[in-house]
Amino acid sequence: MEDLNFEERGSTQIPASLQQHFSAKLGRQNELEKTPSRGGLGLVVNSSKTPGGKSLQSLASACKVPPSTKKNTIPIAFECYEDETDDQIADVATIKKTEKHPCSPIDTANRCETFDSLAADIEDDMLNLEDQDVVLSEDRPYGDVIDPAESEAEALAELGVEEWDSYPPIDPASRIGDDFNYVLRTEDFAEEGDVKLEETRHRTVIADIDEVKMSKAERNELFSMLADDLDSYDLLAEEANLPL
């Protein structure tokens, strides 16, 4: 039985599962035969012919321990401080102060020559400072503070208007007339109408009818006044309701 070759016997090939079964019966070691199988995208994937071969392969790959690299550890030291009991003061690092050396005007101009287009003028001003002429001008410089009262007085003086001693003036009309040569006459104000008070009899508020005794004539006069008022209100209401 050991010399029998199941693949060469017969006209049909024995399935791999049956061949492995016979080999197991004969005591031979089962060898996993792998054949390339083509996937749907044209890729060749090696798969085992035995049932559960893929799961065995995945299990074997999962049991492999990946190689580990040893990393050098950095020792870290910790130190605890107690703020309440520790009186030690940490040393403060001293900061070196840069000494400022005096620089001559010529060196300053030489350094500015490569960076400033006015280096020649700066050098000339520094070397010939005493030879400069001082020009005095009567114009007011722009940087000075201008007093508004002074500027107002100058503006009034240019216009020929006399400056008021106090503000507001007591008689502005007469002062303005004097300043601008206006002649004020009483005839100019004659067109203004005078206020005239009209004398008429106002109604009396009646608090108690029993206390106020009115004659028949006075009662009729009061009723006529009320009727006139009602008529006037009716006329106003009619005018308001008229279409435009």
Swiss-Prot record:
Keywords assigned: Cell cycle, Cell division, Chromosome, Cytoplasm, Cytoskeleton, Meiosis, Mitosis, Ubl conjugation
A biological process from GO: meiotic chromosome separation
Tissues and organs where the protein is expressed, per its UniProt entry: Expressed in germ cells including oocytes.
Gene Ontology MF annotations: protease binding; ubiquitin protein ligase binding
Cellular component GO terms, alphabetical: condensed chromosome; cytoplasm; separase-securin complex; spindle microtubule
Subcellular location: Cytoplasm; Chromosome; Cytoplasm, Cytoskeleton, Spindle
Disordered: region residues: 31-53
Coiled coil, from the record: none
Deletion consequences: RNAi-mediated knockdown causes embryonic lethality. Embryos are arrested at the one-cell stage. During the first mitotic division, embryos have defects in mitotic spindle formation, and centrosome duplication and positioning. Chromosomes are decondensed, disorganized and accumulate due to a lack of cytokinesis. RNAi-mediated knockdown at the larval stage causes in F1 embryos a loss of chromosome separation during meiosis I and no formation of polar bodies. During meiosis, impaired cortical granule exocytosis. Immediately after fertilization causes a reduction in cyclin cyb-1 protein levels.
UniProt modification remark: Ubiquitinated by etc-1 likely at the onset of anaphase, resulting in its degradation.
Function summary: Acts as a chaperone and as an inhibitor for separase sep-1. Plays an essential role in maintaining chromosome cohesion prior to meiotic and mitotic anaphase, in cytokinesis and in organizing the spindle and the centrosome. Ubiquitination-dependent degradation at the onset of anaphase is likely to activate sep-1 resulting in the proteolysis of the cohesin complex and the subsequent segregation of the chromosomes. Also required for cortical granule exocytosis.
Assembly, per entry: Forms a complex (via C-terminus) with separase sep-1. Interaction with ify-1 stabilizes sep-1. Also maintains the complex in the cytoplasm during interphase and recruits it to chromosomes during the first meiotic division. Interacts with E3 ubiquitin-protein ligase etc-1.
Protein name: Securin-like protein
Chain's gene name: ify-1
